Amino acid sequence: LHAVTRFLLCMLVSAGFNATSVLASSYEDSKSESLLNTHYFGRFEIALPRGSEISADYKNFDEKIEWVSNEGDSRINQAVDQKVEDLKKGIAVGTFSVYEKTVPLDNGSVLLVSRLNKFYTFNVYLLTAKNTLYHMMAANISEQGLEGGIEKMRLLSNSIYSRPPHQAPPQGGFAIEAGYTTLGSEKFLESVYMGAQIAGHPGTYISFLTKAIFTQEDSLIERFEKRQYDVSIGELANSGSIKTLRKRPRLVNGIQAEEVAVSARIDGKQFYAFQLEYKGTVESNTRPYIALELGTHEQGSDFKSDEEALKFWDRVVNSLKALP
């Protein structure tokens, strides 16, 4: 009887420890999730640790669109006047073209047209209804494309809106910094490149690229098996032997992607290169090429194990979703 009692007691204690372990693990996962903030890049959302340093480039018409100010009314005239002066002097950033004319657009937006030989350059200042100011520069516009280009800028001036950073754009919108555009999901080339230094992990960065493509390349796994490594994996492979942690297809919130994850030990430091990639559909903004990556700076990773690094990676990957 005593033996049976001791056995049952041991089982209960063991079960208690297991339950505590499960609850602790669940609590830690919940705590980790609560420390992630959702961000919006183009037609996707992704969650990253709070306090991470994030920088992103957004493109419409395959040209970078940059946030200038949330006080657009008070900044636009100064910005336009300064750009006109620089263009007239031939010292404008990014172009040797010389000022030719100013074209008023809708909603208070302004287009500056400059010229070098047979080609034109646009500097457009875009003002939203809620007073956010953006700038875009487009170069190498032919004389035949001039009027069509001006109409595209007019269309953009009527299709750009402000957005609180924590709010998703409305259905069909393309998220940019503090705003979004509504040019239509399949009409014009779009892309986003984001890089983030991860808070709490000084040796770790996350990058995210999404862009419309004209042709498909070999898949991530095909390139990996041919040893046609991308930069992050290639650097580790060139520095020493790499350990393959994962190489597999992976479905992420409806995105049929592929995943490769490797690690390497170099000069006593631990390095990781994790990649998730979707090949994309040709000439599609709603099903573009996608590349999500976790990499390690020269100082090495502070993750205590491969499992911890992969667990962090999985939280980021699982947060990746296409916007409606």
Enumerate the language-model features and the residues they cover.
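Bacterial N-terminal signal peptides
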Residues: 7-18
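Signal peptide processing junction and immediate N-terminal pro/mature segment
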Residues: 19-25
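Post-signal peptide N-terminal segment of secreted/secretory-pathway proteins
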Residues: 25-37, 49-135
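Surface-exposed amphipathic alpha-helical segments
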Residues: 52-53, 137-177, 292-324
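A short acidic-to-branched-hydrophobic micro-motif
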Residues: 54-94, 137, 190-231, 259, ...
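Signature of long, low-cysteine stretches enriched in small and polar/charged residues
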Residues: 86-130, 209, 215-284
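A short, solvent-exposed beta-edge/loop patch
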Residues: 121-141, 278-299
